[in-house]
A protein has these predicted regions:
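Glycine-/charge-enriched secondary-structure boundary and capping motifs
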Residues: 3-5, 14-18, 23-30, 47, ...
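Acidic-glycine-rich active-site phosphate/pyrophosphate-binding loop
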Residues: 79-81, 87-89, 193, 232, ...
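Short, acidic (Asp/Glu-rich) active-site segment that either coordinates a divalent metal cofactor
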Residues: 85, 176, 189-239, 243-244, ...
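Residue-level signature of catalytic and energy-coupling elements of molecular machines
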Residues: 34, 86, 199, 274, ...
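Glycine-rich phosphate/pyrophosphate-binding loop regions near the starts of catalytic domains
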Residues: 44-208
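A generic structural signal for residues located within well-ordered alpha-helices
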Residues: 33, 37, 104, 213, ...
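Acidic/polar, glycine-rich intrinsically disordered N-terminal extensions of enzymes
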Residues: 20-53, 57
Length: 384
């Protein structure tokens, strides 16, 4: 019966291809997808991609899959692959407003590689996904240039990606970013909250600003309703930066200084926390065992002025601020107390300004703040 229907349909002149095309075909380009512009975008990013390549990269742009040699792990006793994926969130809206698209590429890489660094992993390679309303090769090239910068900072090779044009779903100037990275760590050298002991020392690494979390709140209380002129005016309370520049400061990438410590002093770092969404309160506890607390001494570190600036605008108290933003600490290391001085020396040699911010005490896997009321003590503008 099925075969008869097919034959009869083909015998009907109204169902043949010529009659369909006579009615006028709709091309992919007419539907809003410009494959020619896509090809131009690929050409525009080639140099940026190539500058991230490592010796282990196999193949080149244009293949169906990114290739990377596993020989990188040949000297490891028990190599473990570590993967991470993340995005930049609504910080992209500020990049669009400013017409500046490279820094969010750095943010994208930072969010992924800093996460896998929490296991002690060395980032190996990175892939990106760009969804955009209307493909513009110049904007894509700027975004990918930032991604390549982030890859170079972290040592990850950019071995693949996707540019997806979404006409009718996204506005022409709208875009979103996602990233995916893979790293490797030798199992005996993995960082693990289970290794944390009473008396271990907390060393904080400074953030550059808000990083890439909390921007829905930031936009609501700081930028919504403001003109572009206002947002580009230098602000004394931001050290002379404009609001836009301060908010678009890219997320710091901690891979090279932390990996330097891990290579030179195996076992000195027990675990570490990447301070992202949820602030210090909801991230530092992820680096703890269930029977230990992190005693954090508030006021022992400084914070970029944009953080109290935003907290003031949102009328956040200390408790809420600490569970929303990084408050000046982008990463916290849990360190063997006998190795603190050596760890500090290595970090300083790598250009960091590490600070001892607390210690590990018996508890229940929580963050315990000492002198919480001092959070904004050196930043009176936050309390205005």
């Amino acid at each position: 019966m099925t075969d008869r229907i097919k034959v009869n349909a083909m015998d009907n002149d109204e169902t043949k291809w010529p009659s369909w095309t006579a009615q006028g075909a709709t091309t992919y380009a007419e539907a809003g997808v410009d494959t020619a512009e896509g090809a131009r975008a690929v050409d525009a990013i080639k140099d940026a991609v190539h500058r991230t390549y490592r010796d282990e990269v196999r193949g080149d742009i244009g293949g169906f899959g990114g290739l990377f040699s596993i020989n990188v792990a040949k000297n490891m006793a028990d190599p473990i692959l570590v993967s991470g994926t993340d995005g930049v969130g609504t910080k992209i809206q500020l990049a669009r407003l400013a017409g500046k698209h490279d820094t969010v590429g750095i943010d994208l890489v930072a969010m992924c590689v800093n996460d896998i660094l929490a296991t002690g992993a060395e980032p190996l390679f990175f892939l990106d996904y760009i969804a955009i309303g209307k493909l513009k090769s110049e904007a894509v090239a700027e975004i990918v240039s930032g991604i390549a910068d982030g890859c170079q900072m972290s040592g990850a090779a950019l071995i693949g990606g996707e540019m997806a044009e979404h006409p009718g779903v996204m506005d022409p100037n709208e875009y979103d970013l996602s990233g995916f990275c893979v790293g490797v760590v030798d199992r005996p050298e993995m960082l693990d909250p289970a290794k944390v002991q009473e008396g271990d020392v907390l060393i904080g690494l400074a953030s550059s600003g808000i990083h890439s979390n909390g921007y829905s709140l930031v936009r609501k209380v700081v930028t919504d309703g403001k003109t572009l002129y206002e947002l580009r005016m230098p602000q004394e309370s931001l050290g002379g930066q404009s609001v836009l520049d301060a908010l678009l400061e890219p997320t710091r990438i901690y891979v090279k200084p932390v990996r330097s410590v891990l290579r030179q002093l195996p076992g000195a770092v027990r675990s570490l926390a990447h301070i992202t969404g949820g602030g210090i309160t909801e991230n530092l506890n992820r680096a703890l065992p269930e029977n230990m607390d992190a005693e954090l001494h508030v006021g022992t570190w400084s914070m970029p002025p944009v953080i109290p600036f935003v907290c003031r605008a949102a009328h956040l108290d200390e408790h809420e601020a600490l569970k929303t933003f990084n408050m000046g600490l982008g990463m916290v290391l849990v360190v063997d107390p006998s190795k603190v001085d050596q760890v500090m020396d290595i970090l300083e040699a790598e250009g960091e300004t590490p600070t001892v911010v607390g210690r590990i005490i018996p508890g229940s896997g929580e963050v315990a703040y000492v002198d919480q009321e001092k959070l904004f003590a050196d930043n009176p503008s936050a309390e205005e």
